């Protein structure tokens, strides 16, 4: 991480604490019950390190810990986490729209830069780029849950039925290898995809701008799509 001061309107806190708060918010949005093991997996740190970090966050009034070990964001912690996701979103857009960086690279760069953004620079980015526009991965500024995606008429590519056309709307952005894998197969935000066949193991055969490609379930479950024909159905 950058050795630079962090900026937020609630607390002056360390980069590490900001990372934990954002990880909790993102894990919650995906429907996970956030416990120490969840955070250890998300942040790739040891369980003892998580225990110490959560203890400090609780002392600072940024999280609550239930009797069963579930970690929840307190109001102050949620405010910081949401602010950080907005900055992350703006930096991703800046890197792609102004500097022309490839969509599958911007997440990692934004992770490094988001902690060093001042309120003034954030305001200038917002004025320059505008609001209400998806990031290069197709995701909205606010962290969305699976339910909120579905309310917008989206469903997972893994649920699309053969014989129909869909358009990629958003992609899970935390896995760089996945993003590069999808880019090689021309599965990117805005791309049109024809679902040709579902194999016995649920692997999908797709037609994209890259030609005929195969996509496993684990990857297809990270891609949100919308229908391109009125009769398109999805599996429950």
Model regions and ranges:
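A short, conserved structural fragment
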Residues: 58-68
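Key DNA-contact positions within bacterial/archaeal DNA-binding proteins
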Residues: 48, 104
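Basic, amphipathic "hinge/linker" alpha-helix immediately C-terminal to the N-terminal HTH DNA-binding motif
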Residues: 69-88
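Short alpha-helical segments that sit at the start of domains
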Residues: 2-21
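Mid-protein regulatory/catalytic core that forms ligand/cofactor-binding pockets
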Residues: 3-6, 114-224
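Basic amphipathic alpha-helical segments that dock to polyanions
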Residues: 20, 50-60
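Short acidic, hydrophobic short linear motifs in intrinsically disordered regions
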Residues: 30-40
């Amino acid at each position: 991480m950058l050795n630079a001061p962090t900026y937020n309107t609630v607390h002056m806190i360390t980069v590490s604490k900001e990372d934990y708060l954002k990880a909790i918010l993102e894990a919650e949005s995906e429907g996970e019950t956030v416990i120490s093991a969840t955070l250890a997996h998300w942040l790739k740190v040891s369980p003892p390190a998580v225990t110490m970090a959560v203890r400090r966050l609780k002392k600072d009034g940024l999280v609550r810990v239930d009797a069963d070990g579930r970690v929840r964001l307190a109001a102050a912690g949620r405010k910081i986490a949401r602010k950080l996701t907005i900055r992350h979103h703006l930096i991703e857009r800046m890197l792609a729209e102004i500097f022309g960086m490839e969509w599958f690279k911007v997440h990692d760069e934004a992770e490094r830069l988001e902690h060093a953004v001042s309120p003034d620079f954030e305001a200038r980015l917002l004025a320059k780029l505008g609001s209400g526009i998806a990031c290069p991965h197709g995701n909205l500024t606010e962290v969305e849950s699976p339910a909120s995606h579905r309310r917008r008429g989206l469903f997972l590519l893994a649920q699309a039925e053969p014989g129909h056309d869909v358009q990629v709307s958003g992609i899970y952005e935390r896995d760089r290898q996945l993003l590069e894998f999808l880019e090689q197969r021309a599965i990117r935000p805005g791309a049109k995809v024809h679902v040709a066949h579902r194999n016995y193991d649920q692997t999908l055969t797709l037609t994209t701008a890259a030609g005929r490609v195969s996509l496993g379930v684990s990857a297809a479950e990270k891609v949100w799509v919308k229908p391109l024909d009125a009769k398109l159905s999805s599996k429950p």
